[in-house]
Amino acid sequence: MRRTLKTLSPCLVAFLLMLTVAFAGNAQELQKKLEGLKGISGIEKLESDHYAEKYLVRITQPVDHKNPAAGTFTQRVIVAHVGFDRPTILVTEGYGAAYALNPRYQEELSKLLDANMVFVEYRYFLESTPTPCNWEYLTAENSAYDLHNVNQTFRELYTGKWVSTGISKGGQTTCLYRAWFPDDVDFSVPYVAPLNRGCLLYTSDAADD
């Protein structure tokens, strides 16, 4: 018995070393892929109790998507990685994204579907506020274009099914995003979405244009 344990010990150590190297390689692969995405900067590794890898990144967005002369700003995005072959949940937050930085945070659909998560802070909130802060460009349309840019950028990494979701104003954002870009995601799951008639009429007219 002792001889068997002595024989297995070096094998076990070698196996554990191989696992360590493999995990480190996967992490480096993801970070390199993030670094290679257009418009992505400020990549920071985050701790997570639920995801294999989690990063805070910033994506450069036009302040006004129809007027490049208005300048750019950086929008905060949290990327939680499960696998390149897994579905991706696009969280269309309606406010700030600070709570998603918590290591214990796990989005519900991401948990149910064993899916990646791309969590987008709404423009003009917290660290996604342009400088100078011109409120003229805080529109639902610009927000939808922000999400479209995020979607198209991260589709280079995650080529599977995409699901957009949000709660309250985030649910509203999910609906409006789908109105402007109906083909960006495969499913939209708003958790409560307060909308008024004026908003719906404006969105319908703008999307038709």
Where are these regions (language model features)?
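Conserved alpha/beta-hydrolase
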Residues: 112-127
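Conserved small/polar residues in nucleotide/adenosyl-binding loops
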Residues: 202-209
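Short glycine-enriched nucleophile-adjacent loop
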Residues: 171-182
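Bacterial N-terminal signal peptides
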Residues: 11-20
